[in-house]
């Protein structure tokens, strides 16, 4: 912001003070988020580390993410499958009666709502996809290491 000169009592009523207007969107485009967090000397990984280091960093983080995804996925699949199995047993035993027409009506209603929301959210999703592909293009070595590590983490 522009500096203002100190005001005295008579100047307080005058409207001749000038201010500089800053465009925050342009500022944000020029100053990436990592510069605000980590300082001016930080930047894209490509400029800082060797190819081997980038592959190892991507591979290790990918393996950790894949391993966690596998464990959480197994737990979620077990919970959903177990719940479905219990509902089937209860249904066949006569404890639960399913109104299939109502289920079909609710599913169709949910489909319509999802289509409406998907059409509204399309610009934000496209922007996110564009930013992600740009990041992957700029950091292809780290990204490929991450994908490889992720697949290894899923397999282990």
Swiss-Prot record:
Main subcellular location: mitochondrion
Keywords: Autophagy, Membrane, Mitochondrion, Mitochondrion outer membrane, Transmembrane, Transmembrane helix
InterPro entries, per database record: FUN14
GO biological process, one term: autophagy of mitochondrion
Subcellular location field: Mitochondrion outer membrane
One annotated Gene Ontology cellular component of this protein: mitochondrial outer membrane
TM helices/strands, residue ranges: 49-69, 76-96, 135-155
Membrane association type: Multi-pass membrane protein
Short sequence motif named YXXL, residue ranges: 19-22
Keyword field contains Oxidoreductase: no
Domain of life: Eukaryota
Protein family (similarity comment): Belongs to the FUN14 family.
Summary of the function given for this chain in its UniProt record: Acts as an activator of hypoxia-induced mitophagy, an important mechanism for mitochondrial quality control.
Protein name in UniProt: FUN14 domain-containing protein 1
Species annotation: Gallus gallus
